[in-house]
Amino acid sequence: MSRVAKSSITIPTSVEVIITGNLMSVKGRLGQLNMSIHPCVAIMNTNSKLSFDIITIEKKEQRKAWAQAGTARANTANLIQGVTEGWKKKLTLIGVGYRAKVMGKILDLTLGFSHPINYKFPEGIIVETPSQTEIIIKGMDKQKVGQVASEIRSYRPPEPYKGKGVRYIDEQVIHKETKKK
């Protein structure tokens, strides 16, 4: 039995959860998110608490079913936080001449290449640049926010000798020692 699926989720008063068949819809002050539910997972909504269980299946499939129930519970908690508070990732640019600026729906990155990089971010994502070397990515969908942050980081990941590149604000880069004669 999944330890994650055992714990129930308390639904805040500002959030509305609608379950129809294998689709869950979560509405909050920031918007609405949808998620499909695995057929072996049963979700009960009682007294503004969501509890997760599995639909009785064969003994050999129960382990996978509980894993799906735990995943559904974690994803539901992420949806609820997304529609109430939202998700945020911060990136920092380290290197001489590395800078970023937002122009409408395009993030313009100068990362030491011979050309600037224009990254068009998807719908539902807000990108801010409080300074030239800081990027803040906000949105309701945790997966989308993480994906956008990962794509921006992949243009120039931090290198291990000087640490130059795009990194998450809390990321620790392990430095290598240079070759000695």
Swiss-Prot record:
Where on the tree of life does the source sit, at the highest rank? Bacteria
GO MF annotation list: rRNA binding; structural constituent of ribosome
> Which Gene3D superfamilies does the entry mention?
Ribosomal protein L6, alpha-beta domain (3.90.930.12)
Set out the biological process GO terms recorded for this chain's protein. cytoplasmic translation
Swiss-Prot/TrEMBL keywords: Ribonucleoprotein, Ribosomal protein, RNA-binding, rRNA-binding
Q: Name one GO cellular component term.
A: cytosolic large ribosomal subunit
Q: Does the keyword DNA-binding apply?
A: no
Family designation: Belongs to the universal ribosomal protein uL6 family.
**How does this protein assemble?**
Part of the 50S ribosomal subunit.
Q: What does this protein do?
A: This protein binds to the 23S rRNA, and is important in its secondary structure. It is located near the subunit interface in the base of the L7/L12 stalk, and near the tRNA binding site of the peptidyltransferase center.
Protein name as catalogued: Large ribosomal subunit protein uL6
What's the name of its gene?
A: rplF
